[in-house]
């Protein structure tokens, strides 16, 4: 285990540097050795799961290999972790710091001390040189490290290197709004007294889930820098919007006009300025202050006034701000439901398996009366397992004093509770009944969705469940309803089918969704034009029914399919009860043509071991989309009320469509199912997209892990997996883009999914190219299975026994298996026949070529030609292009007419006659008859 040690009371610089080191050393863990700065603590309350943190008490010292220490050179700043520095089995200690004159007492193997403004800068430069990409949160926390330690690039120790590092982090996606929220550049002395007064007199109240603050300060003279003070108040008081009023006396600067106005009773020497800051979506301070002569931006504005009553003006603007605040998202709108629960007597080991199976980070605990009695997190379980209590009940480790929320708790309040109490999940209770749960991830997804909607970006609302607020269409999907787009792009009969299906689902109280490829292709056709995507025909439709776990024995999807068959009796129904799915197939229907509609019950999957068949159970639409392979395929459109036509995009699929990249949903996807590698390649090449970098990393790791080879060598490989692999190979090798797909598969080393030794060598490439040429010339009508021939070329590089094993495992046709198995035998026989003593070795007669090759099928001959030398290819080409077209003028009927008696001799006569024609000895019917009289004379009549 490699550990990255943060000093006690960690600030953003040490955290940012640690996060960067964790990227440089995959698998390493970050240890906060003794607490953190309050702002860091607040940051981690929301973003803890983004980083490989580990509790100090969960570390087993015996497994420590290397220690990386950031922003520190003193052992006493590491707390109890300082004891690890003297472990006898420790391989190395490395220190990265920017404090050149700091006291040091640690004996390290690697020292990197450089005079820059932040330790994070040193690590960023390493990341740049290694060409490592960062996520938004990773880039943001590292940018915070540089901002905090350089005073946002204003401190004297700031260097050009810090500026360049920060610029690179911005390119990596660092979020300025997140940085502004947590950066703390410090206060100038003149404002410190006013800040204390403002903190003491601040009025704060919650409105629609948002904290509003206001304070009125009075000074003798104008004080500069109050905008900075306002921003600091907004951050430290946890307000979402703040109005700061400042009343001051103009004093000696009064003009004669001011004195005249004062004599008339008008207060003219008093000035009033108001500064506003807001982080509340859809509020606009400029609109509020413009009527008073103010200006600025939606989130930051100010106004300077005179001749007014300050308290009155502040009250007016404060009330106007309240009216601007939008109705917030409530817990019921995005909570996950139903909640997966366990009993208090469930063992730690059992609870851990549940977490692993469903991908949760914690579980709620209920008693037999279904009342909430506790909650247990993955960290709690990890700690219990670390100490060997796998068989202990969870009731001894669960948190009993559970913080809960109500269904109508607004999102801002939920966020505040999570930060204040450092909790990652909040059960939703309705009159003591557990109705849902909101996790930290759910909140972050909603916040991200809000930010993207505010910035005008479309399509990455990383929301949490069926009840997440669906994304509304914008310019990328048109201003009209998605249903209208469906109606426009789908054939009328298919649109009517979807309408009927939605009506059937709605009468049963279910939600129905169009999911997957149809939604993806709808966007492609609409945004990029139907001309570019003429191959998109919408003949394969996927529907998902969220039946709320109804009809569990059959599945809501199956029941809906059966009902639809009643409306469409011409459809053929196929039911797969194990997976709670059904399919309706129309073949050359007058209206629907050839259409395949899959109807599934919303379900979740679990792979008990790599390359296994998934175990399936009913779930929600969110879980159903979460089990899919790629974000661009995890899109859905609701077809039923409420809000028909709303897009559900929980995982950023629209963003990836716009970025033209294929991103996998889960890190272990390719280990669970290798066919997803082939699907990823297929989508990349077919759509003209790219592999998202992290997805490519996951693919390469899965292949290098050897999991596929171990699966292939098992005594009984999973049949369903080989079927899926065969299907993907068939699609790829049949498609017009097969060359690009094969190139990418080879680059990823993904042919190892078939066999560990299979590589696309230059020789194989030439063979595939030769084969393609032959197929174009001699099988333009595609009577042969072209994909099988291309696969045959690849498998031909393996030993016959391995070749046969793979072909049999893929359940290829018997003739194909036999042809591949006997390929070398066929090649030897052909070579022997073409070099027989009956003909010169360099140029055998045409008849010899024909008679040698005629008994082999085209599949075998095409493979032999592609694999053979130039002379052999020339001979087989001659066979197909000319010799196969030769036939004598005389037939068996002609022989009978000429007086020959039918019998075994006929076959020999016709064969010899054909050979003579092939060798160019005969050219017309008369010559053939003369040849017969010479070589097969009729007996004289008596």
UniProtKB/Swiss-Prot annotation:
Annotated catalysed reactions: a tRNA with a 3' CC end + ATP = a tRNA with a 3' CCA end + diphosphate
| Superkingdom field | Bacteria
What is the official name of this protein in its record?
A-adding tRNA nucleotidyltransferase
This entry's Enzyme Commission designation comes to: 2.7.7.-
* Annotated residues for binding of Mg(2+): 540, 542
Coiled-coil portions: none
Question: What results from gene inactivation?
Answer: Essential, it cannot be deleted.
Kindly list the GO molecular function terms attached to this UniProt entry.
Answer: ATP binding; ATP:3'-cytidine-cytidine-tRNA adenylyltransferase activity; metal ion binding; tRNA binding
InterPro entries of this UniProt entry? CBS_dom (IPR000644), CBS_dom_sf (IPR046342), DHH_sf (IPR038763), NT_sf (IPR043519), PolA_pol_head_dom (IPR002646), tRNA_nt/polyA_polymerase (IPR052390)
Entry binding sites for ATP: 517-520, 628-629, 633, 673-682, 686, 724
Q: Which family does it belong to?
A: Belongs to the tRNA nucleotidyltransferase/poly(A) polymerase family.
The residue ranges of the CBS domain are: 335-394, 398-453
Which organism encodes this protein?
A: Synechocystis sp. (strain ATCC 27184 / PCC 6803 / Kazusa)
Keyword list, A-Z = ATP-binding, CBS domain, Magnesium, Metal-binding, Nucleotide-binding, Nucleotidyltransferase, Repeat, RNA-binding, Transferase, tRNA processing, tRNA-binding
Please give the function described in this protein's UniProt entry.
tRNA nucleotidyltransferase involved in the synthesis of the tRNA CCA terminus. Adds the terminal adenosine residue to tRNA. Acts as a nucleotidyltransferase and not a poly(A) polymerase.
Q: What is the lineage of its organism?
A: Bacteria, Bacillati, Cyanobacteriota, Cyanophyceae, Synechococcales
Specify one Pfam family: PolyA_pol
Tell me which Gene Ontology terms the entry assigns under biological process: tRNA processing
Cofactor(s) named in the record: Mg(2+)
Annotated region Disordered: where? Answer: 452-478
């Amino acid at each position: 285990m490699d550990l990255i040690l943060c000093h006690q009371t960690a600030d953003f610089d040490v955290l940012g540097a640690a996060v960067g080191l964790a990227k440089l050393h995959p698998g390493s863990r970050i240890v906060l050795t003794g607490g953190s700065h309050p702002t860091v603590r607040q940051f981690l309350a929301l973003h803890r799961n983004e980083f490989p943190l580990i509790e100090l008490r969960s570390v087993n010292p015996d497994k420590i290999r290397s220690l990386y220490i950031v922003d520190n050179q003193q052992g006493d700043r590491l707390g109890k972790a300082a004891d690890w520095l003297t472990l006898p089995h420790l391989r190395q200690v490395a220190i990265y710091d920017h404090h050149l004159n700091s006291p040091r007492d640690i004996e390290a193997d690697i020292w990197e001390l450089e005079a820059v403004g932040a330790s994070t800068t040193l690590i960023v430069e390493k990341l740049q040189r290694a060409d490592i990409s960062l996520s938004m949160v990773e880039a943001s926390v590292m940018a915070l490290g540089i901002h905090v330690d350089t005073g946002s690039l204003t401190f004297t120790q700031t260097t050009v290197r810090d500026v360049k590092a920060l610029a690179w982090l911005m390119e990596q996606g660092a979020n300025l709004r997140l940085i502004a929220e947590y950066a703390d550049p410090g206060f100038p002395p003149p404002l410190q007294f006013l800040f204390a007064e403002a903190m003491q007199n601040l009025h704060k109240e919650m409105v629609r889930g948002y904290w509003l603050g206001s304070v009125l300060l009075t000074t003798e003279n104008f004080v500069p820098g109050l905008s900075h003070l306002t921003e600091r108040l907004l951050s430290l008081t946890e307000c979402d919007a703040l109005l700061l009023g400042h009343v001051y006396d103009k004093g000696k600067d009064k003009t004669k006009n001011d004195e005249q106005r004062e004599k008339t009773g008008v207060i003219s020497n008093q000035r009033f300025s108001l500064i506003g800051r807001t982080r509340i979506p859809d509020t606009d301070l400029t609109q509020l202050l413009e009527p008073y002569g103010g200006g600025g931006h939606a989130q930051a504005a100010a106004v300077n006034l005179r001749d007014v009553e300050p308290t009155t003006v502040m009250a007016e603007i404060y009330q106007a701000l309240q009216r601007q605040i939008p109705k917030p998202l409530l817990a019921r709108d995005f909570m996950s439901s139903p909640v997966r629960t366990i009993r208090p007597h469930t063992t730690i080991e059992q609870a851990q398996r549940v977490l692993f199976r469903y991908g949760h980070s914690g579980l709620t605990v209920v008693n037999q009366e279904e009342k909430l009695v506790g909650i247990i997190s993955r960290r709690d379980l990890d700690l219990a397992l670390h100490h060997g209590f796998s068989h202990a009940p969870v009731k001894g480790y669960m948190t009993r004093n559970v913080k809960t929320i109500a269904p109508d708790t607004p999102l801002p309040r939920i966020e505040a509770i999570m930060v204040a109490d450092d909790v990652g999940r909040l059960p939703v209770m309705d009159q003591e009944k557990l109705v849902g749960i909101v996790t930290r991830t759910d909140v972050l997804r909603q916040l991200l969705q809000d930010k993207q909607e505010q910035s005008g970006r479309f399509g990455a609302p990383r929301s949490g469940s069926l009840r997440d607020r669906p994304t509304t269409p914008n310019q990328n999907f048109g201003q009209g309803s998605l249903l209208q787009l469906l109606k426009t792009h789908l054939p009328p009969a298919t649109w009517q089918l979807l309408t009927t299906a939605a009506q059937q689902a709605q009468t049963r109280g279910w939600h129905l969704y169009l999911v997957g490829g149809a939604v993806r292709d709808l966007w492609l056709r609409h945004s990029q034009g139907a001309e570019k995507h003429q191959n998109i025909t919408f003949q394969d439709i996927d529907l998902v029914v969220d039946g709320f776990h109804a009809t569990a024995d059959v599945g809501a999807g199956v029941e809906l399919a059966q009902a639809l068959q009643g409306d469409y009796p011409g459809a053929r129904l196929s039911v797969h009860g194990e997976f709670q799915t059904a399919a309706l197939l129309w073949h050359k229907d007058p209206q629907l043509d050839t259409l395949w509609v899959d109807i599934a019950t919303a379900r979740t999957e679990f792979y008990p071991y790599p390359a296994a068949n998934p175990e399936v159970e009913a779930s929600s639409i969110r879980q159903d989309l979460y089990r899919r392979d790629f974000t661009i395929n995890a899109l859905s459109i609701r077809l039923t009320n409420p809000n028909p036509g709303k897009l559900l995009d929980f995982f950023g699929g629209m963003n990836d469509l716009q970025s033209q990249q294929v991103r996998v949903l889960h890190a272990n996807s390719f280990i669970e199912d290798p066919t997803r590698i082939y699907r990823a390649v297929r989508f990349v090449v077919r759509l003209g997209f790219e592999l998202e970098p992290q997805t490519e990393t996951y693919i390469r790791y899965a292949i290098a892990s050897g999991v596929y080879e171990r699966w292939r060598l098992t005594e009984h490989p999973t049949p369903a997996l080989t079927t899926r692999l065969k299907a993907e190979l068939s699609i790829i090798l049949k498609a017009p883009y097969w060359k690009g797909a094969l190139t990418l598969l080879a680059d990823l080393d993904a042919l190892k999914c078939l066999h560990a030794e299979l590589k696309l060598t230059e020789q194989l490439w030439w063979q595939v190219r030769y084969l393609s040429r032959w197929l174009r010339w001699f099988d333009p009508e595609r009577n042969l299975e072209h994909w099988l021939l291309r696969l045959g070329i690849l498998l031909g590089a393996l030993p016959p026994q391995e070749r046969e094993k793979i072909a049999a495992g893929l359940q290829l046709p018997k003739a194909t298996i036999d042809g591949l198995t006997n390929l070398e035998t066929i090649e030897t026989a052909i070579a022997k026949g073409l070099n027989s003593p009956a003909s010169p070795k360099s140029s055998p007669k045409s008849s010899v070529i024909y008679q040698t090759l005629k008994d082999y099928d085209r599949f075998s001959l095409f493979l032999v030609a592609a694999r053979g030398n130039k002379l052999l290819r020339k001979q087989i080409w001659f066979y197909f292009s000319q010799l196969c077209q030769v036939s004598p003028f005389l037939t068996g009927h002609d022989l009978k007419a000429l007086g020959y008696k039918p019998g075994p001799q006929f076959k020999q006569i016709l064969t010899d006659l054909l050979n003579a024609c092939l060798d160019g000895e005969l050219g017309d019917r008369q010559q053939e008859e003369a040849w017969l009289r010479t070589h097969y004379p009729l007996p004289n009549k008596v």
